[in-house]
Structures are given as C-alpha cells and as structure tokens.
Design a protein with these regions (language model features):
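Short, well-ordered beta-strand elements
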Residues: 32-44, 64-69, 90-91, 138, ...
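Conserved C-terminal helix/tail region of periplasmic/extracytoplasmic solute-binding proteins
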Residues: 157, 381-438
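Hinge/lid segment of periplasmic solute-binding proteins
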Residues: 96-147, 186-189, 204-207, 211-214, ...
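Short, low-complexity disordered leader/linker segments with a strong preference
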Residues: 1-38, 60, 425-438
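C-terminal lobe and pocket-closing loops
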Residues: 282-294, 305-403, 438
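Extracytoplasmic/periplasmic solute-binding protein
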Residues: 138-142, 147, 171-229
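Extracytoplasmic "Venus flytrap"/periplasmic binding protein-like
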Residues: 54-123, 154-165, 268-269, 276-277, ...
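Glycine-centered hinge/linker elements that transmit conformational signals in sensory
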Residues: 174, 225-258
Length: 438
C-alpha cells in the first residue's frame, strides 16, 4: 500500500491552494481511473495504523488498491485546498460535523441507500448521521458514539467522594480535585475539569452542548418542517451557561489553558494527572487504559442536570467525493466498511478504535468489546444521545457559539446575557441565510 509522507501531502496542499478558490459547485477531477483509490481519514498516528489494516483487508478481498493518506493536522483546510484544485480525494472518512459543509460546497455525492449492498444492516438511527437537511443521504454511516464522562477513580476514592450522578455532585467533585490534593503529592497542581475549549472547528460548542441540553436549553430549537428557532439566549440556556462560567471564573476548577486546547491537546493532560474529569468521546478508552491505567479511571454516564442527562451523539461517515473517476470502487469500499468484518476490525483497533459503536446491527457490542464500560457507552447512546440540529449547514452555528462561549469564559463578565443576546441575533441571521428560520 502506497503512502505519502505528511510533507508530501502538505506540498500537494499548497499547490492546490495556489490553483484557485473553492466554490459551491461540484469539484471536477482529472484523475486517471487506473490509479489507486485515494482515501483520506481525519486521524492520529494510532488510528491511522488501524485504518491501514482495514484497507489492506479490503484490497486483499477485492483487488482494489488504496492510496491511503491519514491527515493529522488541518484536515478541513487540506480538503478545501484539494477542492480548489478540482482534485478531491475519492473517499473521505470524517465526522458527521462535516456533512453540512460538504453538501453545501458540492464536495460529496448523494447516496442511494437501496443501491448500497448491506445498507439494510445499518441501524436506522445511524443513517441519520448521513442525512442532509433536504432528507437525502450524503454520507454512509461508519461509526457512532456518545459522549461519556471520564473520572480519575483513584482520586475520587482517596477523597471519599461518591460517583457523581447530578450536576451538584459533579461540581463538588471538580472543586475537591482542584483544592484537596487528590494525587497526594503535596502540591497545588491538579484541576477538576479538562475542557477542549479552542474555537478551532467550534470545539468548545461540541463540549458545552451536552451541558446546555442537560440544563433544558438549546442552541437551535427544531420547529418542524425543516425550520428552526434560536434557543441560545433562552432562560434555560443562559442558566446552563452561567453554571459553566462559574466553573471557569469563580470556582476556577477548569484546567488552565483549556480555552486554546483541541481534543488532541487535551488528552495528555488527563493522562499526566493534571485534570480529573473529562467529558469526551469513548475513543480514548484503549489509550487511557495503557497511559493512565485501567484501574485508575472510570467511565460513567454524564451526571444529570435539571432537564436530564442528554449528551451529544454523533459519529463518522464515509463520504464518496464528487468528481471521482472511480465511482464503482468508491461504492465497493463503502460496502466493505459497513460489513461485520470491517466494523469489528475497527472496534478492535489498538490502542484506539476507529469504530466506537458499530453501525451494523449484526455486530454485538458486548461480545466484541467484552468490557462493561463500552456497554455503558452503548446504553448512553441508546437512551440519552442526540445529534446537532439538521440545518443545511450547522458549522457556522457551532463556530459562532464556540467563539461567544470562549469569550465569556475568558473575560468572565458578571452577566453573560448580553453576549448571548448578541450571539442569538447572529444565529438568527444565519438561519435566515440558510432559509431555515421559522
């Protein structure tokens, strides 16, 4: 299998950037149909190794060669640059958060479920991850997941604190982790909450959304018929965000520097014993088992807020990109990736799975993982998870929300309602621009 180095990818990306500007029309391609299928994933080095094995198995079974390029940094920028040169990869595997933008730009093709072998084995709920605002499908589900709360169990037990089941207990635990020397080293060097709070890709909104929902608030409220209203400045949203502001600004239980952290930057701070509570996806379980120790941390459902325990539940999609000269091979790869064989290979990835919860109904989570923590994840996904609203393109809503929350948590105003009102006005304008306002 041929792989290009990150340097080569960067060089190609710069060349693409110089070739022209992106547009909302489908990208054309000058690809040779005899070349290998070019596949990109948003990956770390660890997950790239898992994908390599899966693609090798695909080639062994089908004879279709894959030119695999894991993208470690600036994924969205590199896709944009390739689109500008009208030479998109054949297949892209990335999170569902990219769906709206990919559709808007004309970068991904429509999926006909009935034409895809094995599509009937994909659970209906997972198909929602690939559905556009127009009701059509533009991505094939590959993996699903729900946010869970990771806690340093050894710290909690040392301080004789219960497993938190409510916001009040969670916040109390965060204060104790910050103030009561849970690691016993005699130093004031630990914090309660770890937050990937950068505005890049709207990460902070990804993290905060679960807590806003648990407080009874929302970023956007669905009104039916593909129409939405803004909920970010409602009394419930405001109260939920005030709670988070207090954790940042008054209790000071959040890891310093969190407002510039991406998820990849945040993970090592949990591993190194700097922070003890982490609301995140379950994909780090394997890595943390090795780096932190399986016996030193626990995986729990998010503690309940005033309105419940709802958390963000999304996943990864397989996008068959526009302009490909290899449409038959695109389809073959998508069909293989949703088979039980490929799904289980993705789940068993060491140290990190690329399939968290399977989309194929014939794959047994408990039998594959044999780990009660993954049963917890599956239970949360089934009963508490929800996606972001299916507006035509949620990216600008997530980005604007992230920027405002970042400002509130950094500046610590006594009253955040004015900034939330300004954000609400901006989101209303965006809804109007997307013709999705009530």
């Amino acid at each position: 299998m041929r792989r290009r180095t990150a340097t080569t990818i960067a060089t190609l990306s710069v060349a693409a950037l110089l070739a022209g500007c992106g547009s909302s029309t489908p990208a054309a391609s000058n690809k040779d149909p005899n070349k290998p299928l070019e596949v990109w994933t948003r990956s770390t080095e660890a997950t790239a190794k898992v994908y390599e094995k899966i693609f090798k198995s695909f080639t062994d079974k089908t004879g279709v060669k894959v030119d695999y390029k894991p993208i470690y940094n600036d994924f969205d920028k590199q896709v944009q640059q390739r689109a500008a040169s009208k030479d998109l990869p054949d297949v892209v595997i990335t999170d569902t958060g990219s769906l709206g933008n990919f559709v808007k730009q004309g970068w991904t093709t429509e999926i006909k479920r009935e034409d895809l072998a094995g599509s009937g084995d994909i659970v209906d709920r997972a198909w929602n991850n690939g559905k556009g605002a127009d009701g059509k499908y533009y991505g094939v589900p590959f993996s699903t997941q729900a946010m869970v709360t990771l806690i340093r169990k050894d710290w909690r037990e040392k301080l004789h604190k219960p497993i938190p089941t409510t916001w009040e207990e969670l916040d109390d635990l965060a204060r104790a982790f910050t103030r009561d020397d849970p690691d016993g080293n005699g130093q004031n060097d630990t914090y309660g909450m770890l937050v990937p709070g950068t505005v890049d890709r709207g990460y902070l909104a990804w993290w905060a959304a679960s807590y806003i929902w648990q407080g009874g608030g929302d970023i956007l409220e669905e009104e039916g018929g593909g129409k939405f209203s803004v909920g970010i400045d409602s009394p419930e949203s405001t109260k939920a965000i005030e709670r988070l502001r207090k954790l940042f600004c008054e209790d000071k239980v959040v890891q310093p520097g969190s407002l510039t952290l991406s998820t990849n930057d945040a993970h090592p701070l949990f591993e190194s014993g700097k922070s003890g509570i982490y609301l995140t996806g379950p994909y780090m379980i394997g890595r943390f088992d090795k780096s932190v120790g399986k016996d030193k941390y626990e995986v729990i459902a998010s503690p309940r807020g005033p309105a419940g325990a709802t958390v963000l539940g999304e996943g990864e999609d397989i996008y068959l990109m526009a302009g490909s000269a290899k449409t038959a091979d695109q389809k073959k790869l998508a069909e293989y990736l949703i088979t039980p064989e490929a799904q289980q290979a993705g789940m068993k990835g060491d140290p990190q799975p690329v399939v968290r919860l399977p989309v194929n109904k014939n794959v047994d989570v408990n039998a594959t993982y044999n780990d009660p923590r993954w049963a917890t994840v599956a239970g949360v996904y089934k009963s508490e998870a929800r996606p972001f609203p299916s507006v035509p393109n949620f990216t600008p809503f997530r980005q604007k929300t992230s920027e405002t929350l970042n400002s509130i948590f950094a500046k610590c105003p006594a009253d955040s309602s004015a900034e939330l009102k300004s954000l609400a006005d901006a989101l209303k304008k965006e809804l109007e621009n997307q013709k999705a306002s009530q």
